[in-house]
Amino acid sequence: MGRLRPEEISSILKGAITDYESRVRTEEVGQVLEVGDGIARVHGLSNVMYQEMVEFEDARGEKVIGLALNLEEDNVGVIIAGDDRYILEGSTVRRTGRLASVPVGQGVLGRVINALGQPIDGRGEIQAEETRPVEIIAPGIIRRKDVDTPLQTGIKAIDSMIPIGRGQRELIIGDRKTGKTALAVDTIINQHDQNVKCIYVAVGQKDSAVAGVVAQLEEYGAMEYTTVINASASQPAPLQYLAPYAGCAIGEYFMHRGEDALVIYDDLSKHAVAYRQMMLLLRRPPGREAYPGDIFYLHSRLLERAARMSEEYGGGSLTALPIIETKAGDISAYIPTNVISITDGQIFLDLDLFNANQRPAIDVGLSVSRVGSSAQIKAMKKVAGTLKLDLSQYRELASFAQFGSDLDKATQETLARGERLTALLKQRERDPMPVEEQVAVIFGGTQGLLREVEPDDVPDWEAQLREYLRSSHEDLLKDIREKKELTDETAERLREAIERFNEGFEPARSEVKVETRPQEEEGEEG
């Protein structure tokens, strides 16, 4: 190898200096001033963003995620989304530059994850297409369209009288142990042929209750299109706070792809309690019932993200079914009234009805769907149009009838009809019904074709009628299913079919009557 001349060395050095790029990696690092109860006060992160994820290095050398929520002049209040036992005064905290986000896509379906999107089902890492921020601004008015497509729950009482549309927010509210979680799980099971992706968010529930819900979803094949997010009572309040937003972000991914998604928040009462705990520890001023001043905004910004997108923006939808637990049936308390005012209607479950074996225990008088009727199929609207009024009249007359026995014939007929309609709306748990069968069954009830059937025999009548129509009149059911209408000709054919069935109907009196919805319920403690 020849020697380099001095001028060559000089030119090589000049070239190296010219091509040199300085790469300086800067990190903003802070120190923990105090820590306790899942909250840390941190000094030194002067440029941290609101809701930015930060990384603690604990005494074991492990990394723990936190979320910056209080941005004060000389320190930052951080909620710790993990084990804070080994985070000590003086521990190092680093900015990540990322807002809280979760993995989304087909890879999360069939999985059980925590509020940070980490798998907790022991089935390995999640193969996600991308991540989405858990907090995002809801779509504006221009990007939305009217709710015009039904979300079939498979529950007769809901699909007929309190219909839910895709993109709607319908509150399920009631005392503990009244069947709230059962309604939600049945709705998920009914989506098996509806092409709706489901997200079930459990906040503050027992792990055993959530495991029970997952087992039921697996048994009915519903986990294939469902993601379960578990932020149980044993997990830190920050994870319970984040869980609904994480579930919403996963649902939004499908909505923005033009698909339909359903997200269930079980329940937002415990979500509000977790938020109150965090805010009190961060020393934010308490208001009514010690909740912070922005408790309404906590839920409104979550539920406003449910939408039916216009065709120009993909035409997808995100339907929200939040659950609220009341105390002694008091729906006028702070959190229940907040969420009632945010949502597009509510399904109120009554403990007295539940104990009287009317299950699902829906109080028709207090339940309403403000936008769902425009999404209801025409066939259901036609057969169930007077159902709510008939039941209201029956309940009113029944309360007066107990005081006297001298009732005129018209009153007796109204009571008898109401008794049969009430029995007709009972439904077993985990037995969602296709909408065409619902139309046929309710048609029989509202058209007086149950007159000769004893109220106790109505469940047998319904089960046998469904079997009879499936075996002998499949064309009739197919006609209702595909056209979604009940023309005069179809109605006449249906009437004739039910009348023929009634002639040979024999109640199976030896069988045990409908033990409807015996509820091990609620992923909540009830």
Curated annotation (Swiss-Prot):
It is found in: Cell membrane. It is a peripheral membrane protein. F-type ATPases have 2 components, CF(1) - the catalytic core - and CF(0) - the membrane proton channel. CF(1) has five subunits: alpha(3), beta(3), gamma(1), delta(1), epsilon(1). CF(0) has three main subunits: a(1), b(2) and c(9-12). The alpha and beta chains form an alternating ring which encloses part of the gamma chain. CF(1) is attached to CF(0) by a central stalk formed by the gamma and epsilon chains, while a peripheral stalk is formed by the delta and b chains. This is ATP synthase subunit alpha. Its EC number is 7.1.2.2. Residues 505-520 have a biased composition (Basic and acidic residues). The keyword Cell membrane applies. One of its GO terms (cellular component) is proton-transporting ATP synthase complex. ATP binds at G174, D175, R176, K177, T178, G179, K180, T181. The record marks S367 as: Required for activity. Produces ATP from ADP in the presence of a proton gradient across the membrane. The alpha chain is a regulatory subunit. Residues 505-526 are annotated as: Disordered. Keywords: ATP synthesis, ATP-binding, Cell membrane, CF(1), Hydrogen ion transport, Ion transport, Membrane, Nucleotide-binding, Translocase, Transport. It comes from Rubrobacter xylanophilus (strain DSM 9941 / JCM 11954 / NBRC 16129 / PRD-1). CDD domains: ATP-synt_F1_alpha_C, ATP-synt_F1_alpha_N, F1-ATPase_alpha_CD. The gene is atpA. Its main location: membrane.
